[in-house]
Amino acid sequence: MTHHPKERPGYLSRRDFLARAAGTGFAISGAGSLLAACSSSTSVAQETSTTGELLGPGGLPLARPDKRVTLPLWEDPIESGLEPETGGTFTVFNYPDYLYKKLLKEFGEKYGVDVQYTAFDNITSGIKRLASGAVQPDVMEMTPDNLDQAVAGKLIKPLNLDYIPNLQKNIWPELADPFYDGGSHYTVPYTLYATGIAWRTDHVTEDIPSMEQPWDIFWQAEAYKGKTALLSEPRETIAMALLRKGHLDINTEDPALINQAVADLKELYDICNIKVGDIQYQSVPEGTSWLNQAWAGDMIAGYIYYLPKGTPATALAYWKADKGKVPVQNDCFSICATTKKPVLSHLFLNYLLDNGVAYSNFVNFNGYQPPLNEIEPESLVKDGVVPENLANSVLTKDDFGPDSSQEMTLTATGQQLWEDGYSDFLAGGGG
């Protein structure tokens, strides 16, 4: 996941990105030391179980949309019926400005606590800071592909769902009991996103949705040289190249497939002087980029925040593939093992899943959709939240399920393969 539209960083040069990757430890090679700091009993060297099942860096089975995983409880959840803790501070650990501060203030006032917001640069660095003891938050943003390490390292606490009735009441069944956390032992869902293509209709002449393979547009973008960009995310970028060639397993650890995807991506430097970055929510609406790989929420946020006055909403367009061919994902929230307010932490998770709170966070602040039963594309268009031409940016529960395509945890070897491939792509443009 990425930052709130008003806070995300600008385009990175390939050299800058490589430096950042080295500094923040994107590669999982450091996972062993991370987990060792959390639990001396945790081993991460083994990549297969005694039955031959693939294991993630945390030593737990790899979850997939068609392979449900129930995570082990490393301690019992808190008892039911306890009163919430009051007074002092309550710390939320998250991406910068990814949660509406007004809502945090209202929660604090309701329960008599001072809510503090501590930010991390990315989820990898956030988990490392938590493991080292550098921060001691109550709750934190979590992603399904990092859940393996957080649970194995005993960094997050098991949940007592008696305190979180909004999970079953308001949330899509597909995410109220997700495949990556069967029984919702450690997480509740927060926001959703899909990966597709955003473009300016007043500059890009092709009918992208009608193309036999819409991803081909990047390899046909000579006319948009210097105005074309991909996400600066290893998994997203390589997955796009895989999908373009019809390879639907975006969690593959086949070196031949990864190497071919990287070779294909390198072609884009000569074709369209491809850029990498995460400001498509701004650059496409403002017209400084005409063609971009993008998350679904980007164009909604861009329409709200960055479309210049007088520019019609129809200048923006977004495409995503059909289910099973479009990468979809969700962010989560978890309770940190460091919390001194476990009851209040449960109530905070329930608060995030309140219909009014989640909707306000979406339409008044970050532009990323929560998985609420009550949200439908038609209603958002009718209410003027989303223009009709961007209605396909809104996800439905039908986009998720066993036949969906989601970037999930890889083995440590697989993660290194993807990271090395992406570094090769970045270096391939001449540095």
Across the structure, where does each feature detected by a protein language model lie?
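N-terminal secretory signal peptides
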Residues: 1-16, 25-32, 36-37
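Ligand-binding pocket segment of bilobal, Venus flytrap-like solute-binding proteins
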Residues: 148, 229-237, 241, 248-317
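Bacterial lipoprotein signal-peptidase II cleavage site
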Residues: 39-46
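A structural signal for short loop-to-beta-strand junctions that line the ligand-binding cleft
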Residues: 131, 135-142, 157-160, 166-199, ...
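Mature extracytoplasmic/periplasmic domains
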Residues: 331, 335-403
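Short beta-strand->loop
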Residues: 157-167, 187, 309-327, 336-338
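Early extracytoplasmic/lumenal segment of secretory-pathway proteins
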Residues: 66-149
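Conserved C-terminal helix/tail region of periplasmic/extracytoplasmic solute-binding proteins
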Residues: 397-431
